[in-house]
């Protein structure tokens, strides 16, 4: 579910020249303690990994929903990704590699249903951790090399973020 002006705000970011855009994913439901915990985690991550990263001149994170991309760029990069889970993590690094900074639009709101049961949260987080560590092993070495050779802090930063549990 998106706010009525979501597409307009994403469109404005495209008009400004951004090729990869992340909207503000926020919580649709607060029905249980687990959905509340998930919502709090989401907003902390939005503040640090979207708004904060952008403030520092680096790319926002991708959340897996509420995203927009220049079509040809997205088509090209997705053809190189074979991931079933965690595609957004690999896509982040491929976007940065192609010099497409991920822009965050805090006012473009997309609502996400949060988990409400502990067993669902455990399974979800286990999948996320597994995919993050898979991509960390795959991309952290190149992140270090790119930092040393090219002073590519954005790519290095993303590769290091994969070590942070979701």
Predicted regions and their residues:
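Active-site phosphate/pyrophosphate-handling residues
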Residues: 5, 72, 90, 109
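Long helical/loop segments within the catalytic core of UDP-sugar-dependent glycosyltransferases
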Residues: 9-83
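Catalytic beta-strand/loop signature of glycosyltransferases that borders the donor
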Residues: 24, 102-109
């Amino acid at each position: 579910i998106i706010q009525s002006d979501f597409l307009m705000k994403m469109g404005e970011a495209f008009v400004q020249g951004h090729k990869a855009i992340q909207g503000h994913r926020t919580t649709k439901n607060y029905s249980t303690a687990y959905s509340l915990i998930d919502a709090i985690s989401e907003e902390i991550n939005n503040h640090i990994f979207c708004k904060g990263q952008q403030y520092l001149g680096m790319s926002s994170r991708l959340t897996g929903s509420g995203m927009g991309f220049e079509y040809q760029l997205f088509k090209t990069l997705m053809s190189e990704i074979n991931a079933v889970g965690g595609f957004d993590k690999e896509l982040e690094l491929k976007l940065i590699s192609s010099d497409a900074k991920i822009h965050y639009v805090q006012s473009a709101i997309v609502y996400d249903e949060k988990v409400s049961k502990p067993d669902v949260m455990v399974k979800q987080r286990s999948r996320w951790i597994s995919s993050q560590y898979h991509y960390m092993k795959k991309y952290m070495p190149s992140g270090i090399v790119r930092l040393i050779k090219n002073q590519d802090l954005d790519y290095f930063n993303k590769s290091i973020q994969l070590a942070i549990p979701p």
